């Protein structure tokens, strides 16, 4: 397991990005400042054991996704802050520097209500 953490909550605006136009989640360690916590899915602090790579499987709330691209800032901020943007676009190029692009089933807020964690 390269990164194993548990969802501990989410901010009141975090789920607004799970729409057809955006289709992403912003994640942060639960130590995020309040202004960032309001727009983020928060998770327990965990050590990045090994960098995730294109082709790896990411499991979010018991739903599996394949990493299709990683932005040039994503691994640094994931390691330092537990932060990145998980984009469900399936794009083979990162749409933003902090994105990890994922391919798989549609992710909805209902998955978060059954949250059991985030694993890669």
For the regions a protein language model found, what residue spans apply to each?
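Helix-rich interaction surfaces within compact, conserved domain-sized segments
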Residues: 90-120
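Short, well-ordered loop/turn sites that connect or cap secondary structure elements
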Residues: 50-53, 58-59, 110-112
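Short, solvent-exposed secondary-structure boundary/capping segments
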Residues: 74-85
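A structural micro-motif recognizing beta-strand termini
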Residues: 28-30, 42-47, 103-106
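Conserved "cap/hinge" positions at secondary-structure junctions
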Residues: 61-62, 117
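N-terminal, charge-rich interaction modules
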Residues: 1-23
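Short beta-strand-centered aromatic/proline hotspots
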Residues: 64-73
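Short, basic/aromatic beta-hairpin or loop at an interaction surface
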Residues: 23-41, 85-99
């Amino acid at each position: 397991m390269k990164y194993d953490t548990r969802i501990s909550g989410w901010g009141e605006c975090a789920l607004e990005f799970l729409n057809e136009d955006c289709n992403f989640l912003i994640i942060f360690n639960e130590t995020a400042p309040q202004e960032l916590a309001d727009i983020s899915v928060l998770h327990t602090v965990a050590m990045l054991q090994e960098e995730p790579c294109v082709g790896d499987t990411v499991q979010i709330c018991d739903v599996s996704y394949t990493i299709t691209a990683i932005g040039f800032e994503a691994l640094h901020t994931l390691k330092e802050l537990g932060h990145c943007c998980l984009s469900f676009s399936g794009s083979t190029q990162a749409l933003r520097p902090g994105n990890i692009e994922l391919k798989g089933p549609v992710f909805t807020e209902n998955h978060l209500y059954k949250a059991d964690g985030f694993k890669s």
